[in-house]
Amino acid sequence: MLSVAARSGPFAPYLSAAAHAVPGPLKALAPAALRAEKVVLDLKRPLLCRESMSGRSARRDLVAGISLNAPASVRYVHNDVTVPDFSAYRREDVMDATTSSQTSSEDRKGFSYLVTATACVATAYAAKNVVTQFISSLSASADVLALSKIEIKLSDIPEGKNVAFKWRGKPLFVRHRTQAEINQEAEVDVSKLRDPQHDLDRVKKPEWVILVGVCTHLGCVPIANSGDFGGYYCPCHGSHYDASGRIRKGPAPYNLEVPTYQFVGDDLVVVG
């Protein structure tokens, strides 16, 4: 009971412990001798504990009072609190608390804008290099590009003949035109063509015509020196091309493709 009263917290001052001896129904054969012992209190008990502080807690509402002969209040001041100093993060222009920061506002903004713009330009340049290297890694290597070109000796192709080569997995037509074919294709009215294009815009030398031998309709291979116009004829669906590779009749929508080529001397051409 004593321990319960001591541990009851703020209710300890209002509780008291009592012990009563209740005699039993049987009488004792001999009177028992009772010896009273003194209860020794532990005076060395620490002050700041639950049992010791329970008697010092406020039992009523807190009321502030003032007197002429007594101190007005009790202050609890914490002298260990320090105000943080941000001087290491502030600029020299705004270190003085008595000076307005508006006088140096434009200079500080200009410096911030300059640093931001420089960082953006550097980031864009680095991103451009990364993207360029990534795209270049996807492109064909030097050995593949070397195989993508073909050299053709023009002296092996007689006049009026067409020779087919294999270039990048496609047929390549090289035609040595006669003067009559050159004059005939030059006189064609461009306005009447489905895909208007002048003959001189499709050749670098009038006597040589270099074309990709794939029909622009469904990708068939035309037959050279045949058709209604003496150029190329696709037997799959009846597309007729002239000696310049221009569509003249049939379902094909465009002219035959002219690849990239250049003449290396008078007797050699490099396609690709």
From Swiss-Prot:
InterPro entries under this entry?
A: bc1_Rieske_TM_sf, Globular_prot_asu/bsu, Rieske_2Fe-2S, Rieske_2Fe-2S_sf, Rieske_Fe-S_prot, Rieske_Fe-S_prot_C, Rieske_TM, Ubiquinol_cyt_c_Rdtase_Fe-S-su
Reaction catalysed by this chain?
Answer: a quinol + 2 Fe(III)-[cytochrome c](out) = a quinone + 2 Fe(II)-[cytochrome c](out) + 2 H(+)(out)
Question: What topology in the membrane does the UniProt record assign?
Answer: Single-pass membrane protein
Q: How is the cofactor bound?
A: Binds 1 [2Fe-2S] cluster per subunit. Fe-S cluster delivery to the Rieske protein is mediated by components of the iron sulfur (Fe-S) cluster assembly machinery that reside in the mitochondrial matrix (including HSC20 and LYRM7).
Keywords on record = 2Fe-2S, Disulfide bond, Electron transport, Iron, Iron-sulfur, Membrane, Metal-binding, Mitochondrion, Mitochondrion inner membrane, Respiratory chain, Transit peptide, Translocase, Transmembrane, Transmembrane helix, Transport
User: Mitochondrial intermembrane topology: which positions?
Assistant: 139-272
Q: Where in the cell is it found?
A: Mitochondrion inner membrane
Q: Transmembrane ranges? A: 105-138
- What post-translational changes are documented for it? Proteolytic processing is necessary for the correct insertion of UQCRFS1 in the complex III dimer. Several fragments are generated during UQCRFS1 insertion, most probably due to the endogenous matrix-processing peptidase (MPP) activity of the 2 core protein subunits UQCRC1/QCR1 and UQCRC2/QCR2, which are homologous to the 2 mitochondrial-processing peptidase (MPP) subunits beta-MPP and alpha-MPP respectively. The action of the protease is also necessary for the clearance of the UQCRFS1 fragments.
Which EC number(s) does UniProt give? 7.1.1.8
Which family is annotated? Belongs to the Rieske iron-sulfur protein family.
NCBIfam families in alphabetical order = Rieske_proteo
Q: Give the miscellaneous note.
A: The Rieske protein is a high potential 2Fe-2S protein.
Q: Can you name this protein?
A: Cytochrome b-c1 complex subunit Rieske, mitochondrial
| Species | Gallus gallus
* Taxonomy of the source species: Eukaryota, Metazoa, Chordata, Craniata, Vertebrata
Which gene produces this protein? UQCRFS1
